[in-house]
Design a protein with these regions (language model features):
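Basic, nucleic-acid-binding surfaces and adjacent catalytic neighborhoods in DNA/RNA-processing proteins
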Residues: 22-40, 53, 58, 79, ...
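Acidic, proline/glycine-enriched N-terminal capping motif
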Residues: 1-129, 267-275, 279-297
């Protein structure tokens, strides 16, 4: 799922490619993509794209008449810019919508059969605000605001980082990287964090997001993001199960869930303790190793 760094770079590219230009026509190519009825989606045809915003992981296109088009990429949604006559590079069933401009087309695609990605058209600032879960902006929040938000309820640190009601725009991938940088267990409870750990987490969050925004900007340069992914070779732990941690060399571990997994380094983050994997630990029961040292025996 595209997260804050990915969406920031998308917005910067969209600013170069479509802001100030007239949307000739929006073609909806999937019956599932539109999640709003009023105002009519046709009301933005022939309108100028006046600006862009980000609401968490959502991309907002601003039009006249107080209209806002909200694009939610979800897990497999992507945006692709093509010059006139160029194909989107995806099968027809994966193309959700086409934003046609005079000098090219912005394709909204989804490489999944679940069809979770969506478009909504809303009118007015209040309607737009209603779509915002209200989490803090990670790069704008003060340390005190961050501390208060984390301690408001007792959740695992992993859950709090990815909860859009607490923090805006962070998902599974960058939360893994943040926690590795902060040297914190993903399952540590937020109310058990001491002041030093909160400072470490705050600093790690800001540093990680900034590093990856810069990295993705450097990859895209003046073009359009084409390889938006949750997995990067330069990541420390995310998507690197069984590969060596770049800090200590221990194999990266995982906690498997239904749709994804949490990756961490037991040596760097949990004092060597292996966190229970919901599938394997139940299967192995008493044979489940409790530490990274037992695993390596």
């Amino acid at each position: 799922m595209p997260e804050l760094p990915d969406v920031v770079v998308y917005l910067e590219a969209l600013s170069r490619f479509i802001v100030g230009k007239r949307l000739e026509r929006l073609k909806l190519l999937s019956p599932f993509v539109l999640r709003s009825v009023d105002p009519s989606i046709d009301s933005i045809n022939q309108q100028i794209v006046r600006g862009l915003r980000r609401i968490g992981k959502r991309i907002v296109l601003e039009f006249g008449r107080d209209l806002f088009l909200v694009i939610h990429l979800m897990i497999a949604g992507r945006l692709r810019w093509r010059e006139p006559g160029k194909k989107p590079g995806m099968g027809p069933k994966q193309i959700l919508a086409a934003f046609e401009f005079g000098d090219g087309t912005l394709f909204f695609t989804e490489a999944s059969s679940k069809k979770r990605a969506s478009i909504q058209l809303v009118k007015g600032e209040e309607s737009l605000k209603a779509l915002d879960p209200g989490g803090l902006e990670p790069l704008e929040a003060t340390l005190d605001q961050f501390r208060d938000a984390l301690r408001r309820e007792s959740h695992t640190v992993k859950r709090s980082l990815t909860d859009p009601h607490i923090l805006s725009g962070i998902g599974n991938a960058y939360s893994d990287e943040i926690l590795h940088t902060a040297k914190l267990s993903p399952l540590k409870l937020t109310r058990s964090l001491n002041d030093d750990e909160i400072v470490r987490l705050y600093d790690a969050m800001r540093a990680t997001l900034r590093v990856w925004i810069d990295q993705l900007r450097n990859d895209v340069r003046d073009g359009f993001p084409e390889k938006v992914t949750a997995f990067h070779n330069a990541m420390a732990v995310h998507g690197r199960y069984k590969q060596p941690c770049p800090v200590c060399g221990s194999p990266v571990q995982r906690i498997a869930y239904a749709d994804n997994e949490c990756n961490y380094c037991a040596r760097c983050q949990t004092g060597g303790k292996l966190l229970a994997d919901r599938s394997l630990s139940r299967l192995l029961k008493g044979d489940w190793p409790k530490s990274i040292d037992e695993l390596n025996q």
